[in-house]
Amino acid sequence: SYGQLGSTHHSIHDVAVLRAINNLNIVIPCDNFETQEVIKSAVNYSEPLFIRFGKKPMLKIHNENQSFKIGKGIKVKEGKDLVFIATGETVQRAYQAIEILEKDNFKCTLISMHTIKPFDEDLFLQSIKNTKGIITVEEHSESGGLGEKCASILAQKKIITNFKVIGFPDEYMVNGSQSDVLDYYNMSPKTLAEIAKNLIS
């Protein structure tokens, strides 16, 4: 979803555009396991399916015994202090942020929300019960993506909580490597951990 030739090669609005298309399902796998499973599922899937792949090799998040279904997110970690909802390659960064937070005795939940549409509202609502805060992380514009979807559910359900959307702002992005750009826009594991602490302290 990314190239180093400037803003024209930064695919950060695709989810927002495609979410508006009727019956089009959107999946963003976070590791090799999710990638393999969504490809296998896509063969016999009855509706149009958009799969967004990252460019670089991804770290292993899931074990091979994990179940996978389009439209059903996966709980990677569980803790009561804060919930990270992430998708695609940002799941790995959220995972690393949680490892930093665990050193300070914070216990966090991590949801790999690989399917943006249809969205797993049941898992989202179940995961945020009794938590102190929610952070969404996505390699996408803050408009029209994962964070905005979560915000709309919170508003419709009249849930008041500490909530933070982390993505790309409404501006032309800086140029650099994928890692450098994500770090610049507050998606380094260290910065995510700091944001989490500030959100719930």
How would you describe each model-predicted region?
Residues 2, 52-201:
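Thiamine diphosphate
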Residues 1-44, 195, 200:
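Conserved thiamine diphosphate
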Residues 6, 28, 32-72:
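Catalytic domains of riboflavin
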